[in-house]
Design a protein with these regions (language model features):
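Repeated scaffold domains used in trafficking and secretory/extracellular systems
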Residues: 23-28, 63-74, 105-120, 154-169, ...
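Blade-level signature of beta-propeller repeat domains, shared across WD40, Kelch, NHL, RCC1
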Residues: 228-268
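Short loop/turn segments that connect beta-strands within beta-propeller blades
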Residues: 48-51, 91-96, 136-142, 194-198, ...
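An edge-strand/N-cap motif at the start of beta-rich repeat modules
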Residues: 20-56
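Extracellular mucin-like PTS domains
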Residues: 5-21
Length: 268
């Protein structure tokens, strides 16, 4: 059920980083209907309606686990963080990775596992929702391209999200699904992080839908959020504009994972 949003304040700081520009040389994706799932270092293409999946690449980044992936609507590439190298990478349609930037631990922490793009081409990544970083990936060759232009911390209301997704029609937010309820107890909470306010809100709460967390989420620009459960592979569909979630399909069981898709493909 939809309840009144709960808000808290967040702290922010701004930083600048000098990073070499890296021009795309590998083929982009095509804004197709699929979700893209990264698990450790392997990339999969997932049919969210049927749960069927196939491997795109088995080794995306050398000697790293990739997480916090997002789909850039401006250039149709996937981007993510290669841990523990703290590299921002661009991933082609063939699963080939190119390093765009390398961050220090002081800039981004030890690792990251949530990530997605806003509509303007900024990449937002962090760890569990308690930290956030905004990277400029709008225009290759610009002075700030590939750099962290803002960062900060946020109170995730005693919960945590394992992935987040931007759905333009639903406003300036990143959306995620948390296990548990604000204040304690068992259940599932639909949450959103304000890109303008830098605050978390608990938007709706539901019973326990599946055991464990939802490590990969995907969006459609009609208000639909697909969340893949790690433990059993169930893919649940949430309407962030209101309504009850439903089981959409059964996909792969997964861990050390993250998801992304072209939110502008309406999955006809």
């Amino acid at each position: 059920m939809i309840g009144p949003p709960t808000t808290v304040t967040a702290t922010t700081t701004v930083t600048a980083t000098v990073t070499p520009t890296c021009e795309p040389t590998t083929p982009p994706l095509q804004c197709d209907e699929y979700g893209y799932l990264i698990q450790y270092n392997s990339l999969y293409r997932v049919d969210l309606q049927t749960g069927a999946y196939e491997e795109v690449a088995s080794a995306v980044s050398d000697a790293n686990n990739v997480n916090a992936i997002g789909y850039n609507p401006l250039d149709d590439y996937l981007y993510g963080i290669a841990n523990p190298a703290r590299q921002l990478i661009r991933v082609s349609s063939r699963g080939e990775a190119t390093v765009v930037s390398t961050f220090t631990q002081a800039q981004m922490g030890a690792s990251a596992y949530v990530g997605d793009f806003d509509s303007e081409g900024y990449f937002w990544f962090g760890s569990g929702g308690s930290t956030w970083h905004q990277v400029d990936l709008r225009t290759p060759g610009s002075p700030t391209y590939g750099t962290i232009v803002a960062r900060g911390t946020a109170d995730v209301l005693g919960l945590g999200v394992a992935d987040w997704v931007h759905i333009p029609v639903a406003g300036p937010y990143m959306w995620g699904v948390a296990t548990g309820l604000v204040g304690g107890g068992s259940g599932t909470t639909l949450m959103r992080f304000g890109l303008e306010t830098r605050r978390w809100e608990a938007v709706a709460r539901y019973p326990v839908l599946a055991p464990g967390g939802f490590g990969a989420v995907y969006g459609i620009n009609n208000g639909t959020l697909y969340a893949s459960n790690n433990a059993v592979g169930e893919i649940w569909a949430f309407n962030v504009l209101g309504g009850d979630p439903y089981l959409a399909s059964n996909g792969p069981v997964s861990s050390s994972n993250d998801g992304a898709r072209c939110v502008l493909n309406m999955l006809d």
